[in-house]
Amino acid sequence: MKLPITIIMTKVAALLPLKAHSSRVQGKNFKEFCGKPLFRWVFDKLLSISEIELIVINTDARSLLLQHGLEESDRVMIRDRPREICGDEISMNKIINDDVKNVPADIYIMTHTTNPLLSKNTILNALKTFQKNIKENKADSLFTVNKIQTRFYDKNGKAINHDPKNLIPTQNLETWYEENSNLYIFTEDSFKKTKARIGQEPSMYVTPLVES
């Protein structure tokens, strides 16, 4: 009897896009935050996780990274961002695509430098959840969310998810999930199908509010 082929995913690459300019907060990635540059907080968390084999920094700020003591190593790859995908209006999916095309990996974990409170424990648990989902064919990607149960209104003050005349406890309201951009976990295959970090069959992972 022919046994099914088991694919063992081993190489995990973390994608950490970083640019020199920010339209809202000038130079935010390099501003000091509690004793070190903002980008170092999530970078150091990723570096502390042995399951992550490679951290890929897609950037237009190589010289600034060097000034702040960050150099390439066997676990850190600094990629110069092509001019055509530089700028504030460029979709993040285009930047991710540039990395996926050029850096082979079994699993990609994408996060942002603006997640300094994201914990090592959350990253590891999300990764384990994704690996379990893949093994059981439950999902092809994962993204993090905030779980919300509260009363929403539209811009005209019209109730969206509740009846103001019948105020039930908020814990009994329909649960809504807010994408929080903490983490996206996916494969090359799932990315190719949607050309996006969220695949065709994603799973949601609720993160602690203090981290998101």
Regions found by a protein language model. Name each.
Residues 11-16, 39, 55-57:
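Hydrophobic targeting segments
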